[in-house]
Design a protein with these regions (language model features):
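Secretory targeting signals
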Residues: 39, 52-55, 59, 102-161, ...
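Hydrophobic alpha-helical transmembrane segments
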Residues: 1-80, 245-258, 270, 282-296, ...
Length: 588
């Protein structure tokens, strides 16, 4: 008579719960103690706020806990005798797998219930936040556990499982690291955006997520405005990905050869993924170390690191040191040809990425700003960059961009047309720029189709491009870090002049204030008022001008709030109109 297939075995579940009780008990106790470490003497609204702030960071603990749970439950697959003995028992593979998956979920449910139950005792009317805590914890665990089970099916030993778990969790950031270290320097000015790489790394995204729009106020108490849909959607997608990994693990387990127990990987394709990842990681690690030493050593260390990674990776996969065979050497040659070819193709840039400048009619707005400017480019100061929409001013940005693109960013007498080769010379030789100082310029275009283009350039202070930059950043909007200069000028409250060590003068008269602003505007028009120190000589400082004006701050949902905003302007010797006005003022 044909035996009925069972997809679940309750006895195995109970055995797992008792066999690995120390693991889930310790985690449950740790979660309870962690929640008890909060200041429970605070009022319930404050405790609720603390709990909301922990929902994202606690994902790191689920990352490790899920790996430990999967390693314990599926550890029998990594030992030859245990693996063969297990599969000789009258228990179907599907039944054993699904029972272990259910055991893992129980191992997550018990700590979540314990921690949430303890938290609910102190949350009073905010008890429902404990339920949100439990839900987010379980969904985070489902993703990491699903990935860990998938890695367990792909690996033949625990070390291989841990290696693949780490690589897959941080794969996008590892790719970003390799690209920014090896390929980005060959594309002068190009900046690889981290946004999508971070989005594809759940460890980072879950860690920084807030799931509730909840704030605490000492007077109003807890203020709940709703759930943060974007974070919850991302969490649900991750949990869904965890379920997909569990399904893939089930498909792999049905085909898993028992003789692979003890091998580094159980399936050959995963061996290729591990070998390439391991080789690149080790190569870039040594490359980074060599880059610190300089003088041609970075690429030498890269080659050594890749050689070590390739052969030691094969040793792990083959479980032998006898890997110096024709097959392995031919694979190494093919890998190096592909790698060097990709570097050469990046350097040649057949797609014209380096020289790409959007057309004026494609641009919605453009922005250009400097690193280490005296102004604070953030929303708190009311200034989040100078976004230009006027077509003529956008064309000005494009012209400066074109000039910077063809300005050598290293020492020497290379012509602009050879700037890309010159970049490689600088990278290979790690030259010291002949002692020149550099200014970092950021260019950003927001296109009408929603895309954004970023470029970053390191411009020598002595280059011709500095003159154009100095003129551009002498615009009053850049000098005072405001988007509406005329409105700022009309609302000035007071002006204070500082020079020397203790000398100062306050201008109370509207006439004096407007005369000073007229002198500053004249220097802005002349292109000499740029505020970055590299636009002027080392000994050109004359005075500071501290200006306060009435401003309106946009506070989002709280509306607009009136207040006072201040900024200061540095006067240098080449600001001849402002210097002349200050001299006349001091003589009066």
């Amino acid at each position: 008579m044909k035996l009925r297939t069972s997809f679940f075995n309750f006895r195995v579940l109970l055995k797992n719960i008792t066999r690995f009780a120390p693991l889930w008990i310790l985690y449950a106790v740790g979660e309870v103690l962690g929640l008890m470490s909060l200041d429970l003497e605070n009022e319930a609204a404050q405790i609720a706020n603390d709990l909301c702030c922990l929902m994202g960071p606690v994902s790191v603990f689920h990352l490790v806990y899920a790996l430990l749970v999967a390693a314990c439950l599926f550890g029998d697959l990594f030992d030859g005798r245990l693996c063969n003995g297990l599969h000789a028992m009258p228990l179907h593979r599907e039944g054993w797998l699904l029972t272990n998956i259910a055991s893992g979920l129980v191992f997550a449910l018990i700590p979540a219930l314990a921690g949430g139950g303890v938290a609910a005792l102190f949350l009073e009317k905010y008890w429902w936040i404990a339920l949100v805590w439990q839900g987010t914890s379980l969904l985070q665990f489902v993703f990491f556990f699903g990935l860990a089970v998938f890695c367990a099916m792909c690996a033949g030993k625990r070390l291989g499982m841990v290696a693949m778990y780490g690589i897959l969790n941080f794969l996008s950031m590892l790719i970003l690291w390799v690209v920014t270290r090896l390929y980005e320097p060959l594309l002068p000015g190009v900046v690889i955006s981290e946004f999508w790489f971070a989005k594809l790394c759940p460890v980072l995204s879950l860690f920084g997520s807030d799931y509730l729009d909840y704030t605490y106020d000492k007077i109003l108490g807890g203020i709940f405005r709703g759930f943060i849909g974007e974070s919850l959607r991302y969490l649900v997608i991750c949990a869904g990905a965890g379920v997909v990994f569990l399904l893939l693990a089930w498909l792999l387990y049905r085909k898993r050869p028992l003789e692979k127990a003890g091998d580094f990987v159980a399936f050959r394709p995963m061996g290729a993924v591990f070998l390439l990842s391991y080789t690149f990681i080790l190569g870039v690690l040594l490359y980074t170390f060599g880059d610190l030493l300089g003088s041609y050593r970075d690429y030498g260390f890269l080659a050594v690191g890749m050689l070590i990674g390739w052969f030691t990776g094969w040793m792990l996969l083959e479980r032998t040191v006898k890997v110096f065979t024709k097959k392995v050497l031919l694979g190494l040659v093919a890998f190096l040809v592909f790698f060097v070819g990709s570097l050469g193709l990046t350097l040649v840039d057949p797609l014209g990425i380096v020289t790409y400048i959007p057309k004026t009619e494609e641009i919605a707005s453009a922005s250009m700003y400097l690193e280490n400017d005296i102004h604070n480019y953030d929303s708190d100061s009311g200034w989040d960059g100078w976004y230009i929409t006027d077509p003529e001013e956008i064309a000005w940005v494009q012209e400066l961009h074109q000039t910077m693109m063809h300005t050598p960013q290293s020492a020497g007498n290379m012509e602009g047309k050879n700037y890309r080769a010159h970049q490689l010379m600088y990278k290979l030789g790690n030259l010291d720029m002949s002692g020149q100082e550099y200014i970092t310029v950021y260019v950003q275009y927001r296109l009408k189709n929603g895309m954004e283009v970023y470029r970053t350039y390191r411009i020598p202070v002595q280059s011709q491009a500095m003159e154009g930059l100095k003129t551009f950043f002498s615009d009053p909007r850049a000098v005072f870090a405001v988007t509406d200069y005329q409105k700022m000028k009309e609302n000035i409250r007071d002006v204070t002049l500082y020079w020397g060590i203790e000398d100062e003068m306050i201008l109370y008269s509207d006439a004096q204030q407007q005369e000073l602003m007229a002198a500053i505007e004249a220097d802005c028009e002349a292109g000499t008022m740029g505020q970055h120190a590299f636009f002027h000589g080392d000994d050109d400082y004359v005075a500071d001008i501290d200006i306060n004006w009435n401003a309106v701050y946009k506070m989002g949902q709280m509306g607009d709030i009136s207040g006072i905003r201040g900024d200061y302007v540095i006067v240098y010797k080449d600001c001849i109109n402002t210097v002349a006005y200050l001299e006349d003022l001091l003589e009066e």
